[in-house]
Amino acid sequence: MTSAPLIAFTDVSKSFDGGAVKAVDDVSLDVAEGEFLAIVGGSGSGKTTLLRLANRLIEADSGSITVEGEDISSIDPIGLRRRIGYVFQSGGLFPHISVAGNIGITPKLLGTPEAEISARVDELLDLVRLDRAQYRDRLPHELSGGQRQRVGVARALAARPRIVLMDEPFGALDPLTRDALGDDFRELHRSLGLTTVMITHDMTEAILLADRVAVMRSGRLLAQGTPAELSKSDDAYVGELLRTPRRQAKRLGALLPRDGAP
C-alpha cells in the first residue's frame, strides 16, 4: 500500500496583477516522505511561487495543498512556517543578530528553554561544519557567503522539521563552495530523514542532488520523474534542459585530461 505524500499540490493555481499573470497554472505534484525533489525552470516559470504557496507565504487562488496530511488552509500560517525549514538564496539572516541568535530564533519563538536552545545551536554548528568557538558569536557580515548559507541551513533545521524548502540555496555561491555545500546538504537530508524541496534553475545541480526532478515553464508543470524518466520526455523544453549538462560534460571531457594523465 502506497503511503500518502508528505506534501501534495492538487490543481493549484496562483495569479497576480488581477489575473493578468498566471504564475502557477493548475499544478498537481506530490512529494513523498524522505524524498529530495528539485523543481527546475527559468525565470518566470512559477517554481518559487509554488514553493512559497507550500508554507502560505502567499495564498493559492484555487486548488488544495496538504502538508503532513493536513490541508494548509486550515492551519495557522505562522504555526505552519515554524514546523517547516526554509533556506533562502542569500541565507536570509538577521544582520544584527549573532550566528547563535539566528540559528536559535525559531526554537525561541516556540518557547524552548534557553539551555536547550544553546545545546541545539552547538549541535547544529557541528552538523554544518562550523567551529562553535570561532563562529557562534559572529555577526552575518563577518561570514563568507558559504558560511552564511551554512548558518541558514542550520537555522532551517533548528526546530527539527520533517520538511525543508530551499529557494535557490546555492545559486549565489562560487563553484567550489556550491559543490561542497550541495554534497553536505544531501548527506544531511539522508542522515536526518528529511523531505526536501529545492528550487533551482540549474538542471545539472538538480540531477546531481535530487531523487526526482519536476520541470516548470510559464506556470505549468511540464514533466516530473527521475533523470532517466525525464530523458524519455517528448517535451522540447525538457529535452533542451537535459541536453545542456550533457553538452557541458562532453566539452569538459574533451578539454580536461583524465586524473593522472599528462
Residue ranges, per PLM feature:
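Conserved ABC ATPase signature
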Residues: 138-143, 147
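Helix-to-loop junction immediately C-terminal to a conserved catalytic motif
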Residues: 55
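Conserved catalytic motifs of ABC-family nucleotide-binding domains
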Residues: 160
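Conserved ABC ATPase "signature" C-loop
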Residues: 218-219
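Conserved ABC ATPase "signature" region
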Residues: 115-134, 187
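ABC ATPase NBD coupling module
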Residues: 71-85, 109, 230-233
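ABC ATPase "signature
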Residues: 224-225
